[in-house]
């Protein structure tokens, strides 16, 4: 539909007004948010200013949390985000150190407290373990956010080599890939001894050519991270397990160091560096595998696993090392950007049923290959599970087949 169509139907409304309205709607429905993470290289004074900003934000977070607790215990009143936000100008007037922190950064701190309580009440409502919001100790508050970085607080210089941060100054940044879209927010993060900035931008999806290929995937921990319904087996990298030869001695060394000593700080940095390397390796593996699946298939089907519950089971270490939740999150956003479809299905009995005849039988986990007693099919346990996952995507709860969807073109 064009502006001229609307003008012919809407009387005296000008074409310009209609066109602006169409553009605003297109922007609202045809964009997505994408994060770009870059390494910062602050000078020593700038690093101290960044640490000071984190300290002040943590101090404000704990004070806001304490205020909410006191208000409810003493007066039975639940403070809101807006009530607490109104006190920020007074805080900046009385405590001059807070003038060096952008007002919207402080507002975001109050918003984090509010989100923590929203999560608490939601868990109470759903009968889950509530987990009352806790105070942030030293080293437990590692980021601050400029919620309107596109207009205030943050400015990326034209050469792309420095970023101007309110209260910090011009900080060297390494843009290893170009920034895309319209800048919305910026978050400065501390990871061990390194600093990063994460820009969240509003970008338009980049759909790939339509693809009718569908695939079912079964996630695992050892020996395979992922098995497809076509029989492809992706070996589990097990980065955490492989790093134990270095990580275990580093952690033992840390535990022997005297608290608050310089040697303990150095030992903590070594442990953090090893964990950061493991996380980076795992994230890189997830990104590359997800991108390959999205390029190759139009529809990807996986089990809707209770990953949080599995992370508390006897398989917890393997599940956390595999990083299923991160992989599925990356897969979902890459699929959305490329115009692909990702479907989550009920995982019940997918590893017990025969994909050929439907015969169901429990088997020990160590049994990887078996012969179905119902039809005699010789099957690999994980491949059969992936085939069941794929079949379940096109079958409704009543067993009625659902037509295989075409890949949506965003």
PLM region spans:
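Nucleic-acid substrate recognition interfaces
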Residues: 32-410
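Charge-rich, low-complexity N-terminal segments
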Residues: 1-31
């Amino acid at each position: 539909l064009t502006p001229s169509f609307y003008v012919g139907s809407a009387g005296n409304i000008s074409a310009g007004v209609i066109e602006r309205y169409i553009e605003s709607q297109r922007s609202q429905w045809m964009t997505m948010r994408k994060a770009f993470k870059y390494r910062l290289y602050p000078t020593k004074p700038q690093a101290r200013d960044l640490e000071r900003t984190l300290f002040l934000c943590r101090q404000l977070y704990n004070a806001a949390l304490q205020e909410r607790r006191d208000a409810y215990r003493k007066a039975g009143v639940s403070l809101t985000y807006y009530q607490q936000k109104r006190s920020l100008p007074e805080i900046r007037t009385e405590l001059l150190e807070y003038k060096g922190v952008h007002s919207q950064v402080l507002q975001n701190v109050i918003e984090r407290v509010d989100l923590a309580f929203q999560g608490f009440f939601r868990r109470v409502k759903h009968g889950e373990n509530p987990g009352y919001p806790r105070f942030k100790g030293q080293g437990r508050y590692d980021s601050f956010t400029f919620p309107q970085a596109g207009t205030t607080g943050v400015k990326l210089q034209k050469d792309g080599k420095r970023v101007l941060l309110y209260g910090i100054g011009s900080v060297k940044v390494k843009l290893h890939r170009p920034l895309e879209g319209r800048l919305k927010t910026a978050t400065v993060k501390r990871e061990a001894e390194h600093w990063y900035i994460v820009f969240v931008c509003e970008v338009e999806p980049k759909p790939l050519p339509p693809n009718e290929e569908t695939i079912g995937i079964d996630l695992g921990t050892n020996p395979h991270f992922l098995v497809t319904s076509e029989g492809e087996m992706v070996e589990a990298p097990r980065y955490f397990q492989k790093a134990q030869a270095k990580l275990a001695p580093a952690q033992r060394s840390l535990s022997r160091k005297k608290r608050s000593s310089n040697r303990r700080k150095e030992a903590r940095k070594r442990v953090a560096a090893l964990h950061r390397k493991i996380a980076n390796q795992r994230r890189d593996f997830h990104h590359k595998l997800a991108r390959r699946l999205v390029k190759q298939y139009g529809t990807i089907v996986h089990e809707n696993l209770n990953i949080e519950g599995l992370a508390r089971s006897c398989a917890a270490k393997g599940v956390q090392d595999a990083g299923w939740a991160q992989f599925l999150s990356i897969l979902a956003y890459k699929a959305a950007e490329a115009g692909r479809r990702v479907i989550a299905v009920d995982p019940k009995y997918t590893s017990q049923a025969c994909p050929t005849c439907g015969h169901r039988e429990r088997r020990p986990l160590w049994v990887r290959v078996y012969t179905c007693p119902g039809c005699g099919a010789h099957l690999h346990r994980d491949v059969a599970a992936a085939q069941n996952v794929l079949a379940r995507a096109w079958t409704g709860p009543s067993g009625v087949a659902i037509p295989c969807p075409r890949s949506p073109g965003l």
